[in-house]
């Protein structure tokens, strides 16, 4: 079974925004994996952000794309120019950014024919990209998620998926989460 990979133009990204993107994905890994129903057997092709990579990125605070690229490929013995490089098999793939088409790839989406779900995937990818580009800094710290549905809904609102225009996106992205979308501490 193939999956949906969304490629976003990386031309406007800076070292700061790439680090933001890494931290955003790292902090929301668990929530995204549950919301998007990423199956355990797909994990080898769609790994969560590597904690060691995130830690190195935040400790070193690279100021150039070359420095970010070096950190991204650290620990891999194969050539960086290898098309099917092992670094690419993560929810957030920067291999396509550094080698080839200059795009940032998000790989966490199931094969789907439902137009509303596909739209939700694309809107989420674009909103994540926008957050990475515009936010001054992003933390890799995982948020408290005692109520997954509330956490996802408030996060989606925070990144701009507000109003009737994004109602279906919010519904699709919160559908498989537990809890109550309206109340943080009230049972569903």
Task: Kindly give the residue locations of the regions a language model identified.
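C-terminal accessory/tail domains of diverse enzymes
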Residues: 12-188
């Amino acid at each position: 079974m193939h999956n949906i990979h969304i490629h976003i133009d990386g031309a406007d990204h800076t070292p700061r925004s790439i680090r933001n993107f890494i931290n955003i994905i790292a902090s929301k890994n668990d929530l995204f994996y549950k919301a998007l129903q990423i199956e355990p057997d797909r994990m080898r092709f769609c790994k969560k952000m590597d904690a060691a990579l995130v830690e190195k990125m935040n400790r070193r605070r690279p100021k150039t794309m070359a420095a970010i690229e070096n950190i991204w490929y650290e620990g891999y013995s194969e050539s960086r120019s290898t098309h099917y490089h092992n670094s690419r098999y993560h929810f957030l793939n920067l291999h396509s950014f550094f080698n080839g088409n200059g795009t940032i790839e998000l790989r966490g989406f199931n094969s789907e024919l439902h137009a509303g779900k596909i739209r939700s995937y694309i809107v989420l990818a674009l909103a994540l990209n926008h957050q990475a580009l515009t936010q001054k800094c992003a933390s890799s710290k995982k948020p408290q998620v005692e109520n997954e549905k509330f956490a996802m809904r408030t996060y989606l609102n925070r990144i701009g998926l507000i109003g009737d225009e994004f109602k279906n996106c919010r519904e699709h992205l919160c559908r498989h989460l537990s809890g109550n979308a309206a109340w943080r501490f009230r049972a569903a």
